[in-house]
């Protein structure tokens, strides 16, 4: 599949800090955050004019799901737009809280764990063809996903019985199954619930829920880009060697805690290998594939270069070549410098605070964004691309239709209902358009539906 639909769903941690007022629970803060959303959308679950979905998930975690994207740079812009939209809601919530006697700051964190040990996720979505055996595809992908934390982990200082260690992944400790139809109870690597949000006869949605939330644009590029390349390779019939693990859930935890990448991993066939070797095998296979298939978009050479450099850095235990591009390495450099400067042990609360502050999405306060302003992290996009994505849906996918309809219905003051595939006017006729093709960005039926918004006789008052 040369052209693929991508999407990222991100759950955010939320808290309120104040020296003068009583503490507020995450549920209370989330209600303030979404008050404006509820006022115009009459719900805390809405689709926006940029084609995205914004809602309160289980546990009062704000969640932003990007619109359907068909380019990785476009996906990164829309993922970042979600942070900017939420920052606007934070500013309004803080004003409202202050008026009601709660002077303080609302914090949103793009991370995966809170201080109580709860986990919330970053879910990736990849459109794949219906043909082919999904179980076999999952078998091929799981060893890659278990070891992908080497190249895409967000990094975390883990505390255990007074001891602290730095790990590749925040999410690894909270994964309990290889594949499952659940997302919260058992937290699998791949979710198998068959909800394609497209023509079910043609497509299926690969729903990956094992990954960390990433601040770095280049890490997101690598995370999504490598999966896309492996999918493309498998779709073209390339055979992978059997890398199924004896116990992927045990392995994902052991790999996370070993920054050398050399922790032993026992495969189902009895062979013993390690995460670095497994990642190398996928890298070499994709490299070989690209010699004949060629790059299908402009970022492929950059993805392959960063993939190789990250594996080399881990093998050589010299992270200086990736400390502006890979989240766990960027954060580790910050922590190491602060720890050395202040003669701290790794279990210091001050280091835990830095670990958390890295994921603060406030652009004037979060450590990642302060690094970005100093030019200390690599970029994929310019700031203007994320700013534009706040209002404008991806122009090349079905999201363009949804965004145009939502904007028109809101401007006309009409009642409507939208999901990933349906556009519906809640009038007497209940006019509905079903958009089953996620690649289709023009549709005469949608144009007619929008045109009807201006025809008073079509609506009951």
Swiss-Prot record:
ATP binds at residues 53, 66, 420. InterPro entries: Pup_ligase, Pup_ligase/deamidase. One of its GO terms (biological process) is protein pupylation. It comes from the Bacteria. Mg(2+) binds at residues 9, 55, 63. It holds the Pfam family Pup_ligase. Its EC number is 6.3.1.19. The keyword Magnesium applies. The active site is at residue 57. It is an enzyme of class 6 (ligase). Catalyzes the covalent attachment of the prokaryotic ubiquitin-like protein modifier Pup to the proteasomal substrate proteins, thereby targeting them for proteasomal degradation. This tagging system is termed pupylation. The ligation reaction involves the side-chain carboxylate of the C-terminal glutamate of Pup and the side-chain amino group of a substrate lysine. PANTHER family: PUP DEAMIDASE/DEPUPYLASE, PUP--PROTEIN LIGASE. The reaction mechanism probably proceeds via the activation of Pup by phosphorylation of its C-terminal glutamate, which is then subject to nucleophilic attack by the substrate lysine, resulting in an isopeptide bond and the release of phosphate as a good leaving group. This is Pup--protein ligase. The lineage of its organism: Bacteria, Bacillati, Actinomycetota, Actinomycetes, Micrococcales. The gene is pafA.
């Amino acid at each position: 599949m040369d052209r693929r639909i991508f999407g990222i769903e991100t759950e955010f941690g939320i808290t309120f800090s104040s020296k003068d007022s009583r503490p507020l629970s995450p549920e209370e803060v989330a209600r303030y955050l979404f008050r404006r959303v509820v006022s115009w959308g009459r719900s805390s679950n809405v689709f926006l004019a940029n084609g995205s979905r914004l809602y309160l998930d289980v546990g009062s975690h704000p969640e932003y799901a990007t619109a359907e994207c068909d380019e990785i740079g476009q996906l990164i812009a829309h993922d970042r737009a979600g942070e900017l939209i939420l920052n606007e809601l934070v500013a309004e919530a803080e004003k409202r809280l202050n008026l009601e006697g709660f002077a303080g700051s609302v914090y949103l964190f793009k991370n995966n764990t809170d201080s109580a040990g709860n986990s919330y996720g970053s879910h990736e979505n990849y459109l794949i063809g219906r043909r082919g055996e999904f179980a076999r595809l999952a078998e091929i992908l799981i060893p890659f996903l278990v070891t992908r934390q080497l190249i895409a982990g967000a990094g975390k200082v883990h505390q255990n019985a007074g001891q602290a260690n730095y790990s590749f992944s925040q999410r690894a400790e909270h994964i309990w199954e290889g594949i499952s139809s659940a997302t919260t109870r058992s937290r699998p690597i791949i979710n198998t619930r068959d909800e394609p949000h497209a023509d079910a006869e043609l497509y299926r949605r690969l729903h990956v829920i094992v990954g960390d939330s990433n601040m770095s644009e280049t890490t997101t590029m690598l995370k999504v880009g490598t999966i896309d390349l492996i999918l493309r390779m498998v779709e073209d019939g390339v055979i992978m060697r059997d890398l199924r693990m004896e116990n992927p859930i045990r392995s994902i935890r052991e790999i996370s805690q070993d920054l050398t990448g050399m922790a032993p991993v026992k495969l189902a066939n009895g062979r013993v290998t390690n995460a670095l070797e497994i990642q190398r095998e996928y890298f070499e296979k994709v490299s070989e594939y690209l010699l004949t298939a060629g790059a299908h978009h402009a970022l492929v050479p950059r993805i392959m270069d960063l993939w190789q450099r990250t594996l080399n850095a881990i093998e050589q235990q010299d992270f200086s070549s990736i400390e502006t591009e890979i989240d766990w390495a960027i954060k580790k450099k910050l922590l190491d410098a602060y720890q050395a400067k202040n003669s701290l042990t790794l279990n210091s609360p001050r280091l835990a605070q830095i670990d958390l502050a890295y994921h603060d999405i406030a652009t004037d306060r979060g450590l990642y964004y302060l690094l970005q302003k100093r030019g200390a992290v690599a970029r994929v996009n310019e700031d203007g691309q994320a700013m534009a994505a706040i209002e404008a849906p991806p122009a090349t996918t079905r999201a363009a239709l949804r965004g145009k309809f939502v904007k028109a219905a809101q401007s006309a003051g009409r009642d409507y209902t939208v999901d990933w595939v349906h556009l519906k006017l809640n009038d007497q006729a209940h006019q509905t358009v079903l958009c089953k093709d996620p690649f289709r960005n023009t549709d005469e039926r949608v144009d007619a539906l929008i045109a009807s918004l201006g025809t008073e006789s079509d609506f009951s008052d």
